[in-house]
Structure formats: C-alpha cells, structure tokens
C-alpha cells in the first residue's frame, strides 16, 4: 500500500471518528494501532550491479559467433493482442493490447520503447563470460513471419541457436487464440559443464509502459514482485538515484512486474531455486524500471535441461490472474490482508461480477451495490438511529444529572448507567454501523482505484469511474484539494450535510453547528482526489441513509421515546437504616 493511500484513508477514518464523537456522548476511543512497516533493502546506485544487470563484456567466448547476425521479426496476432518477436535474443519486443487503450484512448505498446526486448536467459560461463541471450542471434525455425489466430487455435514460434557441436539453445513460444497466457519453452543442450554455479536465470527485464494520464499515481502502483513460500515479496523503487534489490532462495510460483492496471509475470512449471528483483526510478519522469528473474537449476551431469514457463502479459483482471492458479492475484493491491482484502475478494468483486453478468453499466452496478449494502446494514442502522434519537431526547435529563452530581463522579456514573438501562439505549449504539462500514469503504477505495473493470467505464458526466470525475481543471494545485473540481464529491458533501441536519444529535448546538459545516467540507476535500466510483457509491449510500432518516423521524412517536425516573435509587445501606428507624 503506498504512502498517500495510507495517509488519505487514515485521515478519513479520523474524520469519521471525530464526527461520531459529536453525534454521540463522549466515549473513550482506543488509539489506532501503528501499522508495522519494514524497510526494503536499498543499495546505492554507485555500487556495482549484480550479474543480472552488469554491462556486457567485449567478447562472448564460446558464443562469439552467435553475437553477429541479422534480425528477423515475427508478428503473432490473436483475439487479445498483437505480439512482436525478434530472432535477436529470441525475445518478446512488443505487445499491443486490442481491448485496452491508454489514458488518451489510443492503442499502446505495453512493453514500452525498450529496443532489445524484455525476455531472456542469463548465465555466467566458467570462463567468466556473462551471457544474455538478447545479445545473440537465433534462427527462426518456424520461418513464418506473420500469423493470426483466433478462438481455440494455437500457434508455436520456434528459435534455435547452434553454438557448437552438441551444444544448442532452443526457445519456443506457444500462443493461444483467446488467452493472454503464452507458454515459454526453454531447452539448454550440452551446457552442463560450461555454466558456472550450475544455474541460469529466466528474466523479465523492463518496466511496463505507463498508460494513465497521472504518471505520479501510476508510479505509486508500479513494482516488481514474487510469490515465494506462500508469501508475497514486493520491491518498490520509490526513490530516484537508488537501486533497489531483493534476492531470495527457495521455490517461487511466479515473479513479475506491474504498473497500475497491467502485469507481466513468469510462472515456472518446474521447481525454481530462487528469485532476483531489481528496480530503479528514472529521474524527472516518475517511470520505474524493473527486473524480475527466476533462478533455475542446470546440473553438471545433465546433457539437456528442459524447462517450461507460462508468461502472462495482460490486464490485472482479478478473475483472469486468479485463474492462473499460482496466487498471481496477490500482486493486486487491495490494502491490508487482514482487513480490507477479504472485503474486496469475497464481497465487492463477486457481487460486481454477478451484477455485470446482466448489467453492463458500472455506474448502475455501483448504485445497486450501495442499495444492497444499505439493505444488509438496515437493521443495524435502524437500531442505531433510533438509539441516537433516544439519546437526544435524554439530553436534558443527562445534563441535569451532571449538574446534580458534579461533585460525586461515582454516583453520577451509577445514575447514568441506570438511566441508559431504563431507557433501553446504548451510548455507543450509534457508532456501530459507521465503524462496520469503514473497512468496506476502504476496500472499495482500493477496488475502484486499481480494478481494471472500472477503467474507462463512464457514468453520467464521469468519463472514467476509476479516476476523479473532474468537471474543471485549475491548471495548478490547491493544497489538500487538488488541481481540479470533481462533482460527485460536491453532491456527496451535500448529502452528508443534509443527513447531519436531520439526524438527532446528543451534543450542544454550538458544537453541532461547527461540525455540521466542517465535516462535509473535509469530506469534500478528501473525496475530490478519489475515484469517481467511490464518490458515487458514498453519494448513493448517503441518499439511502437520508431517506431512512426521514422515515424514522416521521414514524417515531412519543411512545417510542424513553421514560425514565429521575429520582435516584436508594442504596442498600440507606434502605436498612430506614427499616431500623421504623422499628424504634
């Protein structure tokens, strides 16, 4: 979770809790627990790079002949993308998605402008030569330079590099007509005694192209990651002029890189030895360049090593990446694993997917979802609203007690407890629905901000529900507010004001008048930079809450109001004393 997200959500939580303090009697609020953070290992950019990124040597030893040649390009097109392969390195050089456009609604190359390709094998020979297959010229065994497939069709592009007698490298790409997954097949023949450390790396080298207008926000979502031993390993190149590295041993189920809405991941079909991640943020443009590598065994006794990988290069669609069956969905940021992620994975996304089965407009889906949440929480919110109304009716009684027993706190607390019990109210009852909804609200923030389902889906004046619904851009930024005016937050702030206006309060009018204005304004400031979908959800939820409050105010009668006895209950000692006096 990035720093700005934590700060924004924490401020919203604080505002809501402060508001609850003014809407209910003062209660002791436990301080929020500090979220434990761990620093990633940072290495100075001046340190020498590891073998994965060190500069190529002038000679290639056994591979010197293969370093000379001519490049042949092969284009494979399916229902979802157009991929360009190069015989130099037998690598993937370009991938243009068909069903997704960039922030300017133009087709884009997800692999960016890196000229030498992203996918390669890397190893160190025993005579000290660093070999990156992107420096070598392969032979295209398939010969065909262009192929289009669709549906259930499959097509394989094969490359071969003959290094010496009985020594060769074979690489094959297997494409499917309707899938983002590409099988990547590797054979190393006759190199068991030539490669140092009996290990080679399969690496994805290069960050994915930024596709959104807000590059700073996209950089906050860019990272390299791996799933190792059932745990997510993340590397974020958050600072310029520093190289960030992470290297771990063990069996990994995937490594990959991502930007805000897309990912490129390598999934081994056989056991890996470990992972290596590296990242660096480019100066001045927010772009973060990443490398993610799998370490694979190459036994000295083996005459041939054959490994197959699945390469997923495509959108961060939850159902699609989860279908890979290796925990690739963990690369998607849904906030805290123990709090907001369960809401996102088990509630929000399933309901959205179900509704999307027969409703194509996500704005309508959000409205229906807000209604469903209100329906589920209706019994709780009804009980809490009635409790707050009763608390407001009790205020004159409570104030009288506070004056009467101001010098006897114990007696005052005893009488307050008695009155609450007789009136059938819970002093904290009004807080419960709001507190229960906060994890859901935070989870929706992450889903709306990072889920590709909402990307470039509009509703009313909002062109994209995953970003703020700006109706006017200033051209400069106002501190805390932003560089634009979003309209959903304005409407939402109006409903917050109206809801407070018609909700009975247990605090003095002077304090309530301040909060009546201050709370909507603060919510307006914070929601102005949040996804339009979140503003729409909160707007509709508040509208349903206002309707509920009008109904409660209209249907509540005098008989529903608490009736309490102001006379203090006599203690047991005083009762016995009275009985003893009567006998005399």
Swiss-Prot record:
Q: Name one GO cellular component term.
A: plasma membrane
- List membrane-spanning regions: 6-26, 363-383, 428-448, 474-494, 514-534
User: Its domain of life?
Assistant: Bacteria
Which GO molecular function annotation, any one, does this entry have?
A: membrane insertase activity
Q: Which InterPro entries match?
A: Membr_insert_YidC, Membr_insert_YidC_N, YidC/ALB3/OXA1/COX18, YidC/Oxa/ALB_C, YidC_ALB_C, YidC_periplasmic_sf
GO annotation terms (biological process): protein insertion into membrane; protein transport
Q: Pfam families attached here?
A: 60KD_IMP, YidC_periplas
* Localization of this protein: Cell inner membrane
Which family, according to the similarity comment? Answer: Belongs to the OXA1/ALB3/YidC family. Type 1 subfamily.
Function text: Required for the insertion and/or proper folding and/or complex formation of integral membrane proteins into the membrane. Involved in integration of membrane proteins that insert both dependently and independently of the Sec translocase complex, as well as at least some lipoproteins. Aids folding of multispanning membrane proteins.
What name appears for this protein in its UniProt entry? Membrane protein insertase YidC
- The scientific name of the source species is Chlorobium chlorochromatii (strain CaD3)
Q: Which gene encodes it?
A: yidC
């Amino acid at each position: 979770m990035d720093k700005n997200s934590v700060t924004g959500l924490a401020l919203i939580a604080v505002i809501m809790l402060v508001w609850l303090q003014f809407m209910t009697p003062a209660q002791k609020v436990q301080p929020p627990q500090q979220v434990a953070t761990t620093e990633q290992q940072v290495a100075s950019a001046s340190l020498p790079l590891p073998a994965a990124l060190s500069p190529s040597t002038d000679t290639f030893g056994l591979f010197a002949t293969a370093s000379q040649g001519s490049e042949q390009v092969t284009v494979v097109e399916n229902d979802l993308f157009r991929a360009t392969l190069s015989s130099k390195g037998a690598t993937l050089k370009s991938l243009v998605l068909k069903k997704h456009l960039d922030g300017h609604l133009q087709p884009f190359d997800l692999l960016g402008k890196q000229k030498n390709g992203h996918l390669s094998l890397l190893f160190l020979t025993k005579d000290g030569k660093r070999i990156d297959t992107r420096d070598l010229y392969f032979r295209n065994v398939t010969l065909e330079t262009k192929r289009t497939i669709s549906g259930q069709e499959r097509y394989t592009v094969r490359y071969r590099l003959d290094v010496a007698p009985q020594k060769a490298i074979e690489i094959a790409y297997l494409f499917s007509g309707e899938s983002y997954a590409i099988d990547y097949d590797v054979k190393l023949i006759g190199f068991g005694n030539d490669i140092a450390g009996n290990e080679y790396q399969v690496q994805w080298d290069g960050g994915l192209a930024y596709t959104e207008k807000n590059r700073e926000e996209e950089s906050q979502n860019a990272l390299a990651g791996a799933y190792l031993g059932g745990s997510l390993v993340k590397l974020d190149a958050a600072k310029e002029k520093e190289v960030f590295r992470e290297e771990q041993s063990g069996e990994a189920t995937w490594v990959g890189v991502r930007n805000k809405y897309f990912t490129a991941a390598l999934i081994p079909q056989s056991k890996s030895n470990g992972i290596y991640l590296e990242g660096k943020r480019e100066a001045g443009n927010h772009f973060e360049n990443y490398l993610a590598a799998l370490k694979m065994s190459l036994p000295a006794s083996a005459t041939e090593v054959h490994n197959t990988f699945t390469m997923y290069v495509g959108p961060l669609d939850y159902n699609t990446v989860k279908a890979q069956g290796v925990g690739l969905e963990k690369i998607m940021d849904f906030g805290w694993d123990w709090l907001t992620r369960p809401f996102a994975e088990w509630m929000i996304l399933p309901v959205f997917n179900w509704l999307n089965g027969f409703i194509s407009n996500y704005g309508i889906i959000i409205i229906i979802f807000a209604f469903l949440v209100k329906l589920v929480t209706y019994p709780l919110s009804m009980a809490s609203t009635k409790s707050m109304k009763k608390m407001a009716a009790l205020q004159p009684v409570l104030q009288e007690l506070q004056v009467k027993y101001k010098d006897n706190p114990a007696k005052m607390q005893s009488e307050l407890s008695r009155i609450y019990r007789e009136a059938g109210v819970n002093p904290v009852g009004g807080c419960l629905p709001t507190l229960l909804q906060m994890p859901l609200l935070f989870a929706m923030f992450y889903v709306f901000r990072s889920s590709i389902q909402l990307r470039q889906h509009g509703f009313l004046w909002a062109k994209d529900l995953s970003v703020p619904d700006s109706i006017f851009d200033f051209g400069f930024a106002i501190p805390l507010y932003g560089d634009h005016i979003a309209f959903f937050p304005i409407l939402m702030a109006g409903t917050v004001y109206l809801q407070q206006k018609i909700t009975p309060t247990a605090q003095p009018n002077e304090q309530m008048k301040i909060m009546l204005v201050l709370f909507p304004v603060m919510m307006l400031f914070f929601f102005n930079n949040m996804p339009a979908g979140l503003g729409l959800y909160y707007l509709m939820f508040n509208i349903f809450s206002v309707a509920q409050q009008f109904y409660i105010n209209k249907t509540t009668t005098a008989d529903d109001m608490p009736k309490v006895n102001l006379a203090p209950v006599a203690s047991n000692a005083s009762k016995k004393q009275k009985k003893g006096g009567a006998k005399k």
